[in-house]
Amino acid sequence: MDALLKPIYEGVMEGDQDLVVDGVKAALEAKVSAEAILKQGMMPAMAKVGQLFEEGEYFVPELLIAARAMQGGLDILKPLLTSEDVQPIGTVVTGTVQGDLHDIGKNLVGMMMKGAGFEIIDLGSDVKPEQFIAAVKESGAQLVAMSALLTTTMANMPATIKAFEDAGMRDSVKILIGGAPVTQAFADKIGADGFAPDASQAAKVALTLVN
C-alpha cells in the first residue's frame, strides 16, 4: 500500500477520524487522486472492519466509529470524486419501514454500503411505501434496502414490495431486507431479492445484487 494511504487505512480501522482527515488532506496535497484514496485506502479498510466484525473481533461500537472516521474523509472527497467523474457502484435507497422508528441498524447498513462504494439515499425511519417509490423514481436507484426491528412492522415489508409491483417498478429494482426478526425464509416468502443478517453482510449482498 502507498505510504500516503496507510494512515487513512489505519485511521478507519482504529476509528480515528482526525487521522483519516489529516491523511486525506496530505494525500491530496501529494497529488493522490480522490478515487485512489477512496478505493485503495478507505474501501479496503471498511472491508477489513466488516471482516473483523463477522469474525467476532469487532462489535457494533467499532463498526460505528470506523464508519464515522471514514465519513470524515468522504466529506472531503465527495466534491472531488464528482469532479473526477468517479461513478458509484450503484445507488441504494435505505429506510426503516413504516411504523418502525429504529434506525441504528439501518444507519450501519448505509455506512457499510458507502464503504463498499455505493451512493446512499437515506430516507430515515417510519418510511411509507410511497416514499420508497418516490425516492427510487427520483434517483434511479437500483436497490432498496429496508429494515424492520419489530415483528409487528415486518408486515410493512411485503406491503412495500407490493407497492413497487402496483407501480410497475418491481422488475427495475432489487429489494434487500434485514433487521432483528427478519429471516431468509421470510425474505423468500415475501419475494425479496436478498436478505442480510447484519450490516457487513448487507454490503456484500448488495454487491451481488447490482452486479
PLM-predicted stretches and their roles:
Residues 109-116, 121-192, 201, 205-207:
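Cofactor-cradling patches in redox/metallo enzymes
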Residues 20, 56, 102, 113, ...:
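Conserved, mostly hydrophobic/aromatic
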Residues 88-123:
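Glycine-rich active-site/cofactor-binding loop and its immediate structural neighborhood
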Residues 1, 84-87, 137, 167-169:
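Solvent-exposed alpha-helices and their adjacent loops that cap or buttress functional pockets
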Residues 1-84:
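Long amphipathic alpha-helical segments
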Residues 43, 98-100, 126, 181:
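Short glycine-enriched loops at secondary-structure junctions
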Residues 196-197:
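Ligand-binding pocket scaffold of soluble enzyme catalytic domains
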